[in-house]
């Protein structure tokens, strides 16, 4: 499993309240959530994000409220992967459960710049900055988590397992 795209970069402690503000939690429609993704932090996010882009952030990404709406809005906006120094644990699990690829790599999260082009090999945990040529070793997903993400989330993974 791989991802490749342009970087949209944020800092530390990006919480679920700025990923998808609480005023939009009355819907579970992914397209509607995507239309408001990051708007309290980056009002131009929905205008500049392209399918396949990669979000990069610092420490504690996804902290705050335990809402699946946050990774759903990111995934539905077209982001193919989130790279961060660290993730809040509940966000990490919610991302896997809805099929949003994420990867922790402190060095990459610090070095990669906004608008860089990156490629991620999830099987190996490799992140390559195509703009600078530098390669980083992130933490690869265990095989069962890769299977969940490849199935587009836990629900589909279970459905596939039962059929």
Swiss-Prot record:
EC number from the UniProt entry: 4.2.1.33
Keyword presence, Glycosyltransferase: no
GO MF annotation terms: 3-isopropylmalate dehydratase activity
Reactions it catalyzes: (2R,3S)-3-isopropylmalate = (2S)-2-isopropylmalate
Entry superkingdom: Bacteria
Pathway assigned in UniProt: Amino-acid biosynthesis; L-leucine biosynthesis; L-leucine from 3-methyl-2-oxobutanoate: step 2/4
UniProt keyword annotations, A-Z: Amino-acid biosynthesis, Branched-chain amino acid biosynthesis, Leucine biosynthesis, Lyase
Swiss-Prot/TrEMBL GO biological process terms: L-leucine biosynthetic process
The protein's enzyme class: lyase
Subunit structure: Heterodimer of LeuC and LeuD.
Function per UniProt: Catalyzes the isomerization between 2-isopropylmalate and 3-isopropylmalate, via the formation of 2-isopropylmaleate.
Entry similarity comment: Belongs to the LeuD family. LeuD type 2 subfamily.
Protein's name according to its UniProt entry: 3-isopropylmalate dehydratase small subunit
The gene coding this protein: leuD
């Amino acid at each position: 499993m791989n991802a490749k795209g342009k970087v949209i970069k944020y800092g530390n402690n990006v919480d679920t309240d700025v990923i998808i503000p609480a005023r939009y939690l009355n819907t579970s429609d992914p397209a509607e959530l995507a239309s408001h993704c990051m708007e309290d932090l980056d009002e131009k996010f929905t205008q500049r994000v392209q399918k396949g882009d990669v979000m990069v952030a610092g420490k504690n990404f996804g902290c705050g409220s335990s809402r699946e709406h946050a990774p759903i809005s990111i995934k539905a906006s077209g982001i193919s992967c989130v790279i961060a120094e660290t993730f809040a644990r509940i966000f990490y699990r919610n991302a896997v459960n809805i099929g949003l690829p994420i990867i922790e790599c402190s060095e990459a999260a610090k070095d990669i710049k906004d608008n860089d082009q990156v490629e991620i090999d999830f099987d190996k945990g490799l992140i390559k900055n195509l703009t600078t040529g530098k390669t980083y070793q992130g933490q690869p997903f265990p095989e069962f988590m890769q299977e969940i993400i490849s199935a587009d989330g836990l629900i589909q993974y279970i459905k596939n397992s039962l059929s």
